[in-house]
Amino acid sequence: MAPSSPEVSRIRNFCIIAHIDHGKSTLADRLLEMTHTLDRTQMDSAQVLDDMDLERERGITIKSHAVQMKYCSVAGDDYTLNLIDTPGHVDFSYEVSRSLAACEGALLVVDATQGVEAQTIANLYLAIEAGLEIIPVINKIDLPSSDVEGVASQIIDLIGIEREEILQVSAKAGLGVPELMEAIIARVPSPADNGHLPLRALIFDSVFDAYRGAVVYLRIVDGVLRKGDRVRFFANNKVFLADEIGTMSMKRQPKQVLEAGDVGYLICSIKDVKDAKVGDTVTHADAPADKRLAGYKDVKPMVFSGLYPVNSNEFEDLRESLEKLSLNDASLVYTPETSVALGFGFRCGFLGLLHMEIIQERLEREYNMNIITTVPNVEYRVLMTNGETVIVDNPSKMPDTARITNVEEPYVSMQIITLADYIGNIMKLGMERRGEYRNTDYLDTKRVCMHFEFPLSEIVFDFHDRLKSISKGYASMDYEYIGYRESELVKLDVLLNGEPVDALSIIVHRSKAYDWGRKLCGKLKGIIPKQMYEVAIQAAIGSRIISRETISAMRKNVLAKCYGGDISRKRKLIEKQKEGKKRMKQVGRVEVPQEAFLAILNIDE
């Protein structure tokens, strides 16, 4: 039975897109309060939807969150509003694109004190591509430093709308929120009434429940889903029974039926986390749809790093923890690997540095894992002399120089929005990081948008932090992948007493190799503790040593018991000590502390 049109016409599915820290989670709190989904007394913390400790601490949204609200309009009609709260950081744009596919409208939130930022523009383009109705909202209008007129002009230049269409709110104080609710009803289109078609539902998120297995969050695009239906997942053709379906209103609320236009959840005893692929389409097993929903792209990791347990007995625990994390995080990719220095571990693929930090912190907090992380790398393409192409995501897999014809590395196109005063500083940073400057657009008299192309390897380290510090916090950035280009890259090895430490190897541009080698040896000298024998730290390209530092041995004063006496007696004791140290050096292994692996990340400090 197709659902009646009036019901579908009363549904509004929308999301909030904004740059990090522009107040979207606070605005979501006000909407929840206005629709009586929660009252103030239940809000034990600000940002109700950011329920991970990490999200609150860092002040960012990491996971997509869906919540259903009931709202009675000024005209007295009842509406169902489904809000999908999305992340705003560079690394999490895949979460945004999936959430957008489940909506018809988007609130574009811009901070009245900051103006349009790089991530705002990136997410806005994603929303326009998805064909969403955009409602621009200027937030924080009650702050003394707000510049509402200036920001309104930026938004008009960006999406070419009338000034009257821009709403002004203060999410914290609740100003302008009632008008915003009415605008959502009036301007966001209702979902298409496709209840008569075969079932197609888009999975936009999933979480792991220890008792129920995978809980899948989905948006019903076509057809009807009933409790007890047999459903099939397009990606792997597996069939499950819909044990429980329902909607999310802060807590799960079971229902018998989900109809076209609804946003809800599905529990069907999915044991293996890999069966609930985010972005996949769910259909009926007995009367399936012909093709899956369009628009989902497979997520490709951009940054790779090795994660190793400090205690090698915890390898299986680490595997389990990563498996559970990867259900909640569709973009985390991992494969087992071994390292001579660190033993058994995993090579993990991440979307960016923030994503990597968050996974590490979640492993440590939620799963009590003690882990060592190696230097982040990107994926290189190596063309061999025999015509073969090898993908290298780990410096230890880099083939011998004699067998390489050329090496290609991934490049990204980046836009940086900043105050005009900092153009010089940013140009200098761009030159340091092998960036290619393209052009500059003036957004208004004070703010500019600069376009660069960078090798991805140059921005995965500390580029974001450096950009913030040279622009006194004003600059914001966003980047997208544009393909591979040939580069003159070499593998830089670190040797301790002539033995290479594979976990400290890095791939760098030839022009920077000497400088890196010198800095790295100096840094390691300060970190590796003194041994009973001398330790030589060397940086090498192939068989050529380009830099060296020596950690002198700790030595006991063997002459302390000689009060005066014959010089030959003293010499004999010193020679004996030397012999002992030489023997130690042959059998001794230098313990490399965790800080040494992190030293490469902040080599310029």
Swiss-Prot record:
CDD domains, per database record: EF4_II (cd03699), EF4_III (cd16260), LepA (cd01890), lepA_C (cd03709)
Catalyses which reaction(s): GTP + H2O = GDP + phosphate + H(+)
Pfam families in alphabetical order: EFG_C, GTP_EFTU, GTP_EFTU_D2, LepA_C
PROSITE patterns assigned: G_TR_2
EC number annotated for this UniProt entry: 3.6.5.n1
Entry keyword set: Cell inner membrane, Cell membrane, GTP-binding, Hydrolase, Membrane, Nucleotide-binding, Protein biosynthesis
Entry GO CC: plasma membrane
A biological process term (GO) from this entry: positive regulation of translation
Topology class, membrane: Peripheral membrane protein
Localization of this protein: Cell inner membrane
Chief place of localization: membrane
InterPro entries: EF-4, EFG_III/V, EFG_V-like, EFTu-like_2, LepA_C_sf, LepA_CTD, LepA_IV, P-loop_NTPase
UniProt: GTP binding residues: D21, H22, G23, K24, S25, T26, N139, K140, I141, D142
Ranges of residues in domain tr-type G: 9-192
Molecular-function GO term, any one: GTPase activity
Family membership noted in the UniProt record: Belongs to the TRAFAC class translation factor GTPase superfamily. Classic translation factor GTPase family. LepA subfamily.
Function: Required for accurate and efficient protein synthesis under certain stress conditions. May act as a fidelity factor of the translation reaction, by catalyzing a one-codon backward translocation of tRNAs on improperly translocated ribosomes. Back-translocation proceeds from a post-translocation (POST) complex to a pre-translocation (PRE) complex, thus giving elongation factor G a second chance to translocate the tRNAs correctly. Binds to ribosomes in a GTP-dependent manner.
Classification via PANTHER family: TRANSLATION FACTOR GUF1 HOMOLOG, CHLOROPLASTIC (PTHR43512:SF4), TRANSLATION FACTOR GUF1-RELATED (PTHR43512)
Name of the protein described by the UniProt record: Elongation factor 4
Organism: Chlorobium phaeovibrioides (strain DSM 265 / 1930)
